[in-house]
Amino acid sequence: MKVMTAMYTIRRGGAYDRFIMMVEAFLERNCETHCLSLTPIPINHSYFHNHVMYLPLKTVDGLIAKLAVVLLFPLWSFWIAWRKNVDVIIAFGSLYAFLQGFSKWILKKPMVTFIRGSSYFGLKIRNSPRYFLHFNKLVEYLGLLLSDRIITNNIATRDEMLKRLGKRKNIDVQILYNNIPPMNIRKPEDIPNTRGKYGIPGDAKVLVSAGILNRGKNVEILIKCLPTIVGINLYLLVVGDGSTDADFRYEDYLKELAKKLEVDKNVIFTGWLEKEDLWKIYLASDLFILPSLSEGMPNVVLEALGCDLPCFGSDISGIRDILQYDELIFDPGDEKTVADKIQQFFTNRQFLDNVKRLCQSRKDVFAFDWKDMVFEIIMGGGAPQSH
């Protein structure tokens, strides 16, 4: 079996982790895997063939690089797919489905597309021009129409895809939830070391939130809650950073807000952490909270559950799919409800025990082999048929 996929470049974040896992799922089953990219993909395997398009540019993030991708990727993917005689095309996002759709159409090869969240929301919070938002929406729609099978990671996204496709019922749309990754870091002695590293007293309570730090993460609601929570020496760890000027301005805004509310000594920005360091912070914390305004299916919540860390999160698609219970979710715009839940968690033993029980039940749901599942969904019953 030969498959072809593409990834502009590998960055930080859960979506890129899942892309690597998807590629590994095929490599572990001895499938010849071809990947188009602008920078080398960090995979070393005899069945992995990375076709890197080297551009004479200082960065792959500029407008010229992106235009080059839109113009050249379709022809380049056709050349690779034809020359290597691939059996299946895998698009990790509707944009890649659009770019590889030419190959699928000419060569009559089936194409499976992963949809992992709303790129429209991400572009909107970065104040992208309106014409670019409309162009992105059109490209995404065409990418969906070219697909033979679509795999989403939450119920709301699946329903949205079905609505956008309208009468194109011959396109198979399925859900594959993210899983809790294998984790082996149970070292209680790390807890005082981790707390000491960030200057957190041993008797303090610790909230943690993590992810790519941008306006969509809505971290300000947690900072605003801190002054209203009484009787608790409470610290907030904000793990992660951004990658754009807008993201950096957002982090500056959060720091200024903490100073204004006089809680800056209790709000700690750690920057980006590798997985093992993040998990150590989870083990040293008391409660994980993700107050995002939009998500696909956040790995940070699943990893927190995997560390047996109780979790609260926004009542939005992706997070609700993971946490499910009303006791664990909240309106991301309701500051009072968030503060009340935090207060109850640390002062009401019955509420605390119930939250832990519910989180354990959700942890059990997501303890499965994602690589087995993704391979089975893509290839189970034979490759999808091209239409």
Where are these regions (language model features)?
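A short, active-site helix/loop in glycosyltransferases that binds the activated sugar's phosphate group
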Residues: 145-172, 180-184
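Conserved donor-binding/catalytic core segment of Leloir-type glycosyltransferases
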Residues: 4, 201-217, 223-226, 237
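Nucleotide-sugar donor phosphate/pyrophosphate-binding loop at the beta->alpha transition
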Residues: 68-72, 110, 120-146, 159, ...
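Aromatic "clamp/platform" in nucleotide-sugar-dependent glycosyltransferases that forms part
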Residues: 293
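Short alpha-helical donor nucleotide-sugar binding micro-motif in glycosyltransferases
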Residues: 272-273, 280-285
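Short hydrophobic beta-strand element within catalytic cores of glycosyltransferases
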Residues: 310-313
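Short His-centered aromatic/hydrophobic patch
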Residues: 91-96, 115
